[in-house]
Amino acid sequence: VFVGLQNAYNDDLNAEMVGRENVIGAVVELSCEIFNPGFVQRNTVPSGTWFAVGELNGEITSRLKEVQKIMLNVGKCDLTDNIYGAKWTKLIANSMTCPFSSLNLKNWEAVKLPGMFDFSVGVGRESFKVGKALGYMIEPLFGLTNEDIGNAGEDAAELVMKKMVKDVGPNARTHAAQDHIKGRRSEIEFINGRVSKEGRKLGISTPYNDAVVEIAKMTHSGKIDLDPSNINILFKKLEELIRD
C-alpha cells in the first residue's frame, strides 16, 4: 500500500506509478523540517497534529483502518469517504501559506506583515471558488466542523487561515519556503499553479494564485533573493494581473 503524504493534489499521479488499487490518499496538518540527513525537526505537537486518510474510491476498508491505527501514534487521524474533497481542502490551506515562501520568515512572522493576511485570504477565496466549481465537497479540516465552514460562508478562507496559523506552532515554516532555502523547485506550481490551471479551464480569474506562482518562479530562477521585502513585489504583481 502506498500512502501519499505530499501536499500537492497528486493521488492520481501516484496511482499511475504504483496502481490505483495500491494507493491510499492522505491529508496532513503537521509542520516539520528536514535540513540535515536523518534529523527531522517536528514543529507541531501531537495535540495539534491531524491526518485524514481515505481510499480513492471512497470505501472505508480494513486496510484503511490499519493505516489509521498507525497514524494515531503521531496525532489525530480521521477516516474519510471524500478523499478528493479533503485533498482539495488541504490544497486551499497550502495555497494560502505559499505566498510566505519568498519572504524568508516563519509563518507567524509573515502573516503579521501589513497586507499579508488579507492577501492570503484572497488566495484562499479563489481556491475555494475553483474547488466548488470542480464539484468538490469541501471537508472541515483542522478540527473545524461542517457547521463552522457553513456558517463562515465567504469568510471560510479567513477561518481556515486563522486556525491553521494557530495550530501548526510558532516555529512552522511553509513547505515551499524550505524548498527555496534548499534551492529546490517548490510545490507551488502544483498547488497555486493547479488552482490557476483549473481556473483557466473554467473561465475563473485567479490573479492571487497567479501572482504567487510568478514570484515562486522568480525566486527559483534567482531573479530575487529570499527577503521580507518581496512582499512588495508580490503585491505589485497582483496589481498588474488584476489590471491586465
Specify the residue positions occupied by each region the protein language model found.
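Beta-strand-loop-alpha-helix segment that lines the small-molecule cofactor/substrate pocket
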Residues: 1
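NAD(P)-dependent Rossmann-like dehydrogenase/reductase catalytic/cofactor-binding core
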Residues: 121-244
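Short, solvent-exposed coil/turn linker segments
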Residues: 19, 82, 97-99, 106-109, ...
